Amino acid sequence: MQDITMEARLAELESRLAFQEITIEELNLTVTAHEMEMAKLRDHLRLLTEKLKASQPSNIASQAEETPPPHY
């Protein structure tokens, strides 16, 4: 009786281990895909930042360059 219980427990553990290995592999693939997507997004962000810095400055003067109002 005890041998059957031990065999059943062993079979259950082996089954759980197999499912866990499959889940870990699926999660690994998902993490890898997300890392690749994040790398692409970082590159796009870098390019957009460079374009923004290279664009012409605004025609609006900064507050330091503005003349104070007449009542000041």
Curated annotation (Swiss-Prot):
InterPro entries: SlyX. Residues 55-65 have a biased composition (Polar residues). It holds the Pfam family SlyX. It comes from the Bacteria. This is Protein SlyX. Residues 53-72 are annotated as: Disordered. Belongs to the SlyX family. Gene3D superfamilies: 1.20.5.300.
